[in-house]
Curated annotation (Swiss-Prot):
Its EC number is 5.4.99.25. PANTHER family: PSEUDOURIDYLATE SYNTHASE TRUB1, TRNA-PSEUDOURIDINE SYNTHASE. Residues 1-55 are annotated as: Disordered. This is tRNA pseudouridine synthase B. It comes from Rhodopseudomonas palustris (strain ATCC BAA-98 / CGA009). Belongs to the pseudouridine synthase TruB family. Type 1 subfamily. HAMAP family: TruB_bact.
Length: 366
């Protein structure tokens, strides 16, 4: 062994209003088997029938403004005809940027992305606090005052490190089984409990004469940038809310990994004519595991792990690491496992049969 340390394809501008059959309406040419939108039309009731397939990997969508994270997942499931998909951390509808979406077996690695750091670039409009802490809400407090750049910079250390943060009223935090935003929409004002979050870095990038300031922040899991703007405004005595927000980094993914929805649509159109594959848009499942060691095993040991059996680690080739590792065989991802007490114990086994990121062809698992 060696150690190597929704039913419609929605366009961004009409996400709230698109009809259920818009995605297929513009395709006139016959579709071949490369087209993930290919539907079997010969159902007994005469209605189109869509076959779902196994797709494994990550797509880092450059989410457009106006689309919810749930809608984005539905769009990609539709586009790939994927059986299973989920996102690795909600991004507000009014925000743009990186929304990592896990397909198939990649959903087993979602916690590794959600626990990673996130980086945002955001703009705060001073002089007004809103109930949603962004431009969508109604004003609840106003001030004619505007902060100076010096006052803002002097405040930033108070919002760096581990701080106590009260989530926005309009947030996905659960209160006795209900989402805070549902209660807020019903007119209920429920006190939210402060909770610790970690902000690794907070920088003032620009400070304009228009009453707005641009920041960059790198923070940990559970941080609300809207709450950050709200709290800075209160301490500066001028109030504030988010008027622009973009996520630029999520765990191992940055802007170079992001793909716009229009580009995915174009790739799908090319696949329909046999000129490409949606596999080109996928990142490997193990991309989410960059921060943990990789352990290569023999095919014999791989067969045991695949059956859920532990493997003894001994001899000079035994790994020197402990804890969680991801296991490969012949360069192919096999499992998440724990190293301890001289054993390699499988925790999550991957079955990568179907469309994967490694090539434009389908591969079989061991």
């Amino acid at each position: 062994m060696t150690v190597t340390t929704p039913d419609a394809l929605l366009a961004p501008h009409d996400v709230q209003h698109a009809g259920a059959d818009e995605s297929a309406a513009q395709i006139r040419k016959p579709r071949d088997n490369n087209d993930p939108r290919n539907a079997n039309r010969g159902g007994g009731n005469g209605k189109p029938r869509r076959d779902k397939r196994d797709v494994h990997g990550w797509v880092v969508l450059d989410k457009p403004i106006g689309m919810t994270s749930t809608q984005a997942v539905a769009v990609l499931k539709r586009l790939f005809s994927a059986k299973r998909a989920g996102h690795a951390g909600t991004l507000d509808p009014l925000a743009s940027g990186g929304l990592p979406i896990a397909m198939g077996e990649a959903t087993k690695t979602v916690p590794f992305v959600m626990d990673g750091r996130k980086r945002y670039r955001f703009t705060v409009a001073w002089g007004e606090e809103r109930d949603t802490d962004d431009t969508e809400g109604r004003a609840v407090a106003t001030s004619p005052d505007r902060p100076t750049a010096e006052a803002i910079r002097a405040l930033l250390p108070r919002f760096t490190g581990v701080i106590e943060q009260v989530p926005p009223q309009y947030s996905a935090v659960k209160i006795q089984g209900e989402r805070a935003y549902d209660l807020a929409r019903d007119g209920e004002v429920v006190p939210l409990v402060p909770r610790p979050v970690e902000i690794h870095e907070l920088t003032l990038v620009e400070h304009g004469d228009d009453g707005r300031s641009v920041f960059e922040a790198e923070c940990g899991k559970g941080t609300y940038v809207r709450a950050l703007a709200r709290d800075m405004g209160r301490l500066l005595g001028c109030y504030g809310h988010i008027c622009a927000l973009r996520r630029t980094v999520v765990g191992p993914f940055d802007e170079s990994d992001m793909i716009p929805l229009e580009e995915l649509q174009a790739l799908c159109d090319r696949a329909a004519s046999g000129e490409g594959s949606l596999a080109d848009a996928l990142l490997p499942v193990e991309t989410a595991l960059d921060d943990i060691p990789a352990l290569a095993v023999t095919r014999a040991d791989a067969a045991r792990l695949h059956r859920g059996q532990a493997v003894l680690l001994r001899g000079r080739d035994a790994p020197h690491c402990s804890g969680t590792v991801y296991v490969t065989v012949a360069g192919r991802l096999l499992a998440l496992a724990e190293v301890g007490n001289g054993e390699l114990i499988p925790k999550r086994v991957f079955n990568l049969t179907g469309l994967t990121a490694s090539s434009a062809v389908r591969k079989e698992s061991i």
